């Protein structure tokens, strides 16, 4: 994100995301056809950054990055969960602390039949796991 929008802290990224508009960045299914005869939601992303133009603001780009990261994580999780017939995925790590990414998980739950759970203080799960692994040694 630093090369694209000049910021690299979660706080700054979240601030930018709050003012962004994905309609200025992502190409949606609804942008490609007017008839609406689709088996999937017209609001799903067809191409991340598919509508990027010189008019996009840093806020739009920040939200586009967060959305792309969230959608990538969500879809990989959906495909992995489906291959094992799992309906619930628990997400942990620093990215779960970014509201714009969490919103992606909320939006995609209904579309793909997988429930995403983000525990409280989930950004610390990796550290806790490492500490517990060290104790077991």
Which role does the model predict for each range below?
Residues 1-25:
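Glycine-rich phosphate-binding loop plus the immediately following alpha-helix
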Residues 17, 27-30, 38-43:
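Carbohydrate-associated surface elements
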Residues 43-53, 99-112:
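Acidic-glycine-rich active-site phosphate/pyrophosphate-binding loop
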Residues 38-88, 123:
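Adenine-nucleotide phosphate-binding core of ATP-dependent small-molecule kinases
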């Amino acid at each position: 994100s630093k090369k694209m929008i000049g910021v690299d802290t979660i706080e700054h990224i979240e601030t930018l995301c709050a003012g962004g508009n994905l309609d200025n960045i992502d190409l949606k299914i609804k942008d490609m056809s007017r008839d609406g005869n689709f088996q999937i939601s017209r609001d799903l992303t067809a191409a991340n950054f598919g509508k990027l133009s010189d008019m996009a603001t840093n806020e739009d780009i920040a939200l586009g990055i967060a959305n792309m990261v969230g959608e990538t994580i969500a879809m990989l999780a959906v495909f992995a969960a489906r291959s094992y017939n799992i309906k619930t995925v628990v997400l942990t790590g620093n990215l779960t602390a970014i509201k714009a990414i969490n919103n992606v998980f909320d939006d995609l739950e209904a579309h793909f039949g997988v429930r995403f759970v983000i525990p409280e203080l989930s950004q610390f799960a990796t550290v806790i796991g490492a500490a517990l692994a060290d104790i077991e040694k």
